A protein has these predicted regions:
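Flexible, surface-exposed loop regions and adjacent strand-edge segments
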Residues: 33-44, 88-90, 97-109, 156-166, ...
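Generic N-terminal amphipathic/basic segments
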Residues: 91-96, 105, 109, 113-122, ...
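Outer-membrane beta-barrel domain signature
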Residues: 57-59, 108, 112-116, 181-185
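Face-selective signature of the C-terminal outer-membrane beta-barrel domain
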Residues: 75, 79, 84, 118-258
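Extended aliphatic helical segments
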Residues: 11, 16-22, 52, 64, ...
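Short acidic, glycine-rich loop/turn motifs
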Residues: 7-9, 103, 133, 200
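Transmembrane beta-barrel wall of Gram-negative outer-membrane proteins
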Residues: 1-96, 120-125
Length: 258
């Protein structure tokens, strides 16, 4: 869905204009047999790659794309001003159940439940001005543009099981621990510039003198929070169901007072 609207009109000796645009898009994709395999090359004399891991399974991806743009401009006989703000955002959630066959090293078969949620956004503000001074002999043009970027993995859940005779076994030494991850990247930047142009006459010929300045700043923050779920003993129902929801059931969480 998309909605756009703009107009321009006069207010006395000034001209005023504005523009607005809103957009929303949603997508859903289902890959019934997604595959991601790893191979290795053993020797220069062997041209066939050797299987390391063969991974396949259903993968579903749901994505939304909202965006907004608002701008306003003002024009006078000696100056022009513009202000514009834009916001772009993308949120995606992935769910997958993979079957993995490790065929090199510690050979085993695994089932992996994976849930991921990611959100990315960009917000930009643009301020612009242009001025005609001294009867137009001097032109001053400036821009100020801060930008805010975010990329957040708001939740990643990884639950691996080794499949053993039709059942499911938690075996961290072969499959790794069930893990939950949060990642957060924030970036803030600022770009500012000014340009001066002076028009004059030199030896009866038109000439220009230009000068300007630029400032660019950027700051980035990144952090990760991760915890792995460790086990003492068996969890009832895991072997027959392979249900990762059983990991954090109240009855299965160790209590220091028990």
């Amino acid at each position: 869905a998309n909605l756009s609207f703009g107009n321009q009109f006069k207010v006395g000796k000034y001209e005023l204009g504005f523009i607005t645009s809103l957009s929303y898009k949603k997508e859903f994709n289902l890959f019934e047999n997604y595959q991601s395999n790893r191979y290795r090359k053993d020797s220069k004399n062997i041209f066939e790659l050797r299987d390391v891991e063969l991974l396949s399974g259903p993968l579903s991806i749901e994505s939304v794309f909202p965006s907004a743009l608002v701008g306003i401009g003002l024009k006078s006989p000696k100056s022009r001003y513009q202000a514009q703000i834009m916001h772009l955002q993308n949120g995606s959630s992935n769910a997958a159940i993979y079957n993995s066959a490790i065929t090199y090293g510690s050979e085993n078969e695994q089932k992996r439940d994976v849930l991921e949620y990611n959100q990315r956004s960009v917000t930009n503000l643009l301020l612009y001005g242009k001025h005609f001074l001294f009867d137009g002999d001097l032109t001053a043009e400036w821009k100020i543009s801060p930008t805010f970027n975010e990329n957040k993995d708001k939740d990643i859940r990884y639950s691996p099981f080794r499949t053993d005779d039709g059942g499911f076994v938690i075996e961290p030494s072969e499959t790794g621990d069930p893990t939950r991850i949060w990642r957060d990247l924030e970036e803030r930047s600022l770009v500012s510039k000014i340009d001066l142009t002076y028009n004059y006459t030199l030896n009866d010929k038109k000439a220009k003198l230009k000068a300007g300045g630029l400032v660019s700043l950027k700051k980035r923050d990144f952090y990760i929070e991760t915890f792995a779920i460790l086990f003492r003993g068996a969890i009832p129902g895991i072997k027959s169901s392979g249900d990762p929801d059983l990991f954090l059931m109240a009855d299965n969480i160790w209590n220091i007072n028990d």
